[in-house]
C-alpha cells in the first residue's frame, strides 16, 4: 500500500503544480476576460494594445490559441478558459524564455487579446464593440457550474440551468459521457429513455416509476461498483415493497409447493439452473418474473436463502436459506469468516445476492444453461468473486458453497435426508470448513477454475459426503478438527494435516496440485453431481448407497486415483466417509481427497472414479474440496440441492404445508 500510496503521491505532486498553474492561469484569464468583456464590452482597447506589444512568439502563441479557441468556440466559455489556459501555459512555458513572469503577463495579455480575438474571429463582420459577449459567456443562455473532477476518475458533477429548466448531469470523467445530456427542453421531463436519472427519483410525487425502471434495468445491471458481485436485484435497489414482494413470493411458494408438491422440487432441479438463478421458475413459473429479482431470498426454495439470508434467511425463511447456510451467509458471517464471506459480504448487499439475487440472475442464465453451466457461471462468478473478492467470494461462494454445500449438501442432503444431524454436523463442520475453506480459497481459485468438472464430482461426492457427514456428527467435530488441522496444515497440508501427514506427505504436495486438479475434477464431478443433485435428497439415499459405493468407488478411486496414497486415503476416505466423523478418517479422506482428487482428476472423465475421487474429494471437500469441489458442487448443490432441499424443506417447513 505504502509504495502505491507514495507513488501516487509523487505522481500527484509532480502533476499538481502544473495542474494548479493551469487552474490559476485559466482563472486569471477568465477574470481578465470577464472584466474585459463586461467592462470594455468589446475588450478591443487593451487587446489591441497588447496585441501590438506582443512578441512574435506571443503572436504565434496567440495564433495557436486563436486557432484552438476558434476550434472550441462552441464550447462554453468556462470550458474554454481552462482549455486556453492550458494552451497558454504550455506555450508560455515552451515559447517564452521567462515562462513565469511572461506567463502572467502573457496570460493577461492573452486573456484580453484572446477575448478580443475571439470576438473578432467569431464575428469578423461585426465591429468588436458590437459583440458584447461571446455567446458562450452569456449566462442567460446557459450557465455551467463546474466542480473540478478529482483526478483519478469518478464523476464531474455540474449543473446547468436553462432559464427555468434545471438539470443535474453526471459526466463520466474517463470517457466524458454524460449520464444525461442537455437536450431536454422540459423541466419536468423526468424519465427519458436515455436519462432516467435526470430527476431525483424521490422527487416525483409518487416516487420513481419502478416498473419503468425495472424494464430499463431489469436485473440491477447498474451496479457498476459491484464488479465482482452480481448486481442486486432491482427489488433490492429500489424503494418499495420488499416485504410485500416476499410475501407474494411466499404465497406463491405455498401455492406452488402445494400445487406442484415434491414434483415441483424435482422439477426445479432440472430447471434449477434457471430456477435457481432466478429463484427458479422451477419453483413456480408464476413468480419466475419476480423470482428473477427476488427468488434468491424470496423464493421459498433455497434461493431465498442465498438471497434473503438477511431477510428470510436468518429466520430460516427457506430451507434454501439453510442450504445457503444462512449461518454461512448470516450466522457464519458472525461466527464464520468463511461463511461470513459468503453471507456477510452479500449480506450487506442483500447478501446472498450472489446466489440469490443477482447471482441468481447470473446463475439463472448460467444455470439455465445447465447445472453445469450454472456452475460454470458460478465458477466464473466464483473466479470472478474469487479473483475479485478472492477468498471472500470464494469463501462466500465456494466456502459457502462448500460450507453451504458441504453444509448444505451435508446439511441439505443430510439435511433433507438427515437434516438435523447434518445441520448440526454441518454447522460445526461448516464453521470449520469455513476456516479451512479460507485456507483453501486461494487454492480454490485455481481449483475452482479446474473445478468445473470437479464440481459435479464434488457434488456427488458431497452428496455422498453429505450423507456421511450427516451420518457422523462426531465426524463433524472431527472434521472441524480436520478442517482446522487442514487449515493449520495449510492448503497443501490440508490434505496432509491429519492422515495426510502420514499418508500424504507425498500426497499432500501432490495433493495440493491434486486438489487443484481434483478441484477440476470436482468441478466436473460437481457438474455431473449437479444432475445427481437434482435428485439429491433422493440421491442422498442413493448417495448413501453411493457413499458406500463411493467407498467402493474409493477403491475405484484407488484405481482411479493416481496416487496410492490418495487411494489409501481414499480407502481411508471410506473410513472417513464411513467415519466422515473421525477427523483422522475425515482428514485421511481429505488427504485422500487430494490423492483422490488426483484420482478424481484422473477419473474426472470417469464418473465412478470421479465419484470415488469425488468422495475422497468430498472429504477433502469438507476441507479442501469444500473449497474446490464444493465450489463447483456448491453451485449445483446450491442451485439444485437448494431447490430440492428448499422444496423438501418447504414441505417440512410448511411452505408447502
Swiss-Prot record:
It comes from the Eukaryota. Residues 57-76, 112-123, 409-425, 453-468, 648-657 have a biased composition (Basic residues). The gene is SD17. Residues 357-378, 399-408, 426-435, 473-496, 512-523, 551-578 have a biased composition (Basic and acidic residues). KAHRP might mimick human histidine-rich glycoproteins to anchor host thrombospondin or a parasite analog in a binding complex with the endothelial cell receptor. The keyword Glycoprotein applies. Residues 1-34 form the signal peptide. The keyword Manganese does not apply. Residues 57-138, 282-301, 352-657 are annotated as: Disordered. Keywords: Glycoprotein, Malaria, Repeat, Secreted, Signal. Glycans are attached at residue 42. It is found in: Secreted. InterPro entries: EMP3/KAHRP_N (IPR040805). Residues 99-108, 590-614 have a biased composition (Low complexity). Residues 497-508, 628-643 have a biased composition (Polar residues). GO terms for cellular component: extracellular region. This is Knob-associated histidine-rich protein. It holds the Pfam family EKAL. Its main location: secreted.
Amino acid at each position: 500500500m505504502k509504495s502505491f500510496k507514495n507513488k501516487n503521491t509523487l505522481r500527484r505532486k509532480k502533476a499538481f503544480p502544473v495542474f494548479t498553474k493551469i487552474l490559476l492561469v485559466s482563472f486569471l484569464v477568465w477574470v481578465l476576460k470577464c472584466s474585459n468583456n463586461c467592462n470594455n464590452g468589446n475588450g478591443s482597447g487593451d487587446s489591441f494594445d497588447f496585441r501590438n506589444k506582443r512578441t512574435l512568439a506571443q503572436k504565434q502563441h496567440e495564433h495557436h490559441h486563436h486557432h484552438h479557441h476558434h476550434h472550441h468556440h462552441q464550447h462554453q466559455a468556462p470550458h474554454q478558459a481552462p482549455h486556453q489556459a492550458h494552451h497558454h501555459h504550455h506555450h508560455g512555458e515552451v515559447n517564452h524564455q521567462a515562462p513565469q513572469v511572461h506567463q502572467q503577463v502573457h496570460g493577461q495579455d492573452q486573456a484580453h487579446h484572446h477575448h478580443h480575438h475571439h470576438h473578432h474571429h467569431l464575428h469578423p463582420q461585426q465591429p468588436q464593440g458590437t459583440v458584447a459577449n461571446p455567446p458562450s459567456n452569456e449566462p442567460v443562455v446557459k450557465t455551467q457550474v463546474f466542480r473540478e473532477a478529482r483526478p483519478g476518475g469518478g464523476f464531474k458533477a455540474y449543473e446547468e440551468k436553462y432559464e427555468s429548466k434545471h438539470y443535474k448531469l453526471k459526466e463520466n470523467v474517463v470517457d466524458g459521457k454524460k449520464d444525461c445530456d442537455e437536450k431536454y427542453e422540459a423541466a419536468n421531463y423526468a424519465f427519458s429513455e436515455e436519462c432516467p436519472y435526470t430527476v431525483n427519483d424521490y422527487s416525483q410525487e409518487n416516487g420513481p416509476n419502478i416498473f419503468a425502471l425495472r424494464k430499463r434495468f431489469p436485473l440491477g445491471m447498474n451496479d457498476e461498483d459491484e464488479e465482482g458481485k452480481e448486481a442486486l436485484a432491482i427489488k433490492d435497489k429500489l424503494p418499495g415493497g420488499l416485504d410485500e414482494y416476499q410475501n407474494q413470493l411466499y404465497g406463491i411458494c405455498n401455492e406452488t409447493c402445494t400445487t406442484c408438491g415434491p414434483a415441483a422440487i424435482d422439477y426445479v432441479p432440472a430447471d434449477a439452473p434457471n430456477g435457481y438463478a432466478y429463484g427458479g421458475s422451477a419453483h413456480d413459473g408464476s413468480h419466475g418474473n419476480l423470482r428473477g429479482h427476488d427468488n434468491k431470498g424470496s423464493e421459498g426454495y433455497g434461493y431465498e436463502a442465498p438471497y434473503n439470508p438477511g431477510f428470510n434467511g436468518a429466520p430460516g425463511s427457506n430451507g434454501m436459506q439453510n442450504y445457503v447456510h444462512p449461518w454461512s451467509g448470516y450466522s457464519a458471517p458472525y461466527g464464520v469468516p468463511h461463511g461470513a464471506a459468503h453471507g456477510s459480504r452479500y449480506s450487506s448487499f442483500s447478501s446472498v445476492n450472489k446466489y440469490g439475487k443477482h447471482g441468481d440472475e447470473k446463475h439463472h442464465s448460467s444455470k439455465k444453461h445447465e447445472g453445469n453451466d450454472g456452475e460454470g457461471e458460478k465458477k466464473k462468478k466464483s473466479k470472478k468473486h474469487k479473483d475479485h473478492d478472492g477468498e471472500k467470494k470464494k469463501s462466500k461462494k465456494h466456502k459457502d458453497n462448500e460450507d453451504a454445500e458441504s453444509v448444505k449438501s451435508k446439511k441439505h442432503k443430510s439435511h433433507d435426508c438427515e437434516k438435523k444431524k447434518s445441520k448440526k454436523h454441518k454447522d460445526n463442520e461448516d464453521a470449520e470448513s469455513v476456516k479451512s475453506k479460507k485456507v483453501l480459497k486461494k487454492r480454490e481459485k485455481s481449483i475452482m477454475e479446474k473445478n468445473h468438472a470437479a464440481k459435479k464430482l464434488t457434488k456427488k461426492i458431497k452428496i455422498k459426503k453429505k450423507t456421511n457427514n450427516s451420518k457422523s456428527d462426531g465426524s463433524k467435530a472431527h472434521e472441524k478438527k480436520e478442517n482446522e488441522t487442514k487449515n493449520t496444515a495449510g492448503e497443501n497440508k490440508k490434505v496432509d494435516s491429519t492422515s495426510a501427514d502420514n499418508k500424504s506427505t507425498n500426497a499432500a504436495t501432490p495433493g495440493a496440485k491434486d486438489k487443484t486438479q481434483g478441484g477440476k475434477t470436482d468441478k466436473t464431478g460437481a457438474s455431473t453431481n449437479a444432475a445427481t443433485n437434482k435428485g439429491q435428497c433422493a440421491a442422498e439415499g442413493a448417495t448413501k448407497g453411493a457413499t458406500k459405493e463411493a467407498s467402493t468407488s474409493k477403491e475405484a478411486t484407488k484405481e482411479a486415483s493416481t496416487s496410492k496414497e490418495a487411494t489409501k486415503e481414499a480407502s481411508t476416505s471410506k473410513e472417513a466417509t464411513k467415519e466422515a466423523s473421525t477427523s483422522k478418517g475425515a482428514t485421511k479422506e481429505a488427504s485422500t481427497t487430494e490423492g483422490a482428487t488426483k484420482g478424481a482428476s484422473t477419473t474426472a472423465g470417469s464418473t465412478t472414479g470421479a465419484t470415488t475421487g469425488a468422495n475422497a474429494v468430498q472429504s477433502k471437500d469438507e476441507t479442501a474440496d469444500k473449497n474446490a469441489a464444493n465450489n463447483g458442487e456448491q453451485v449445483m448443490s446450491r442451485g439444485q440441492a437448494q431447490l430440492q432441499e428448499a422444496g423438501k424443506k418447504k414441505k417440512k417447513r410448511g411452505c408447502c404445508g
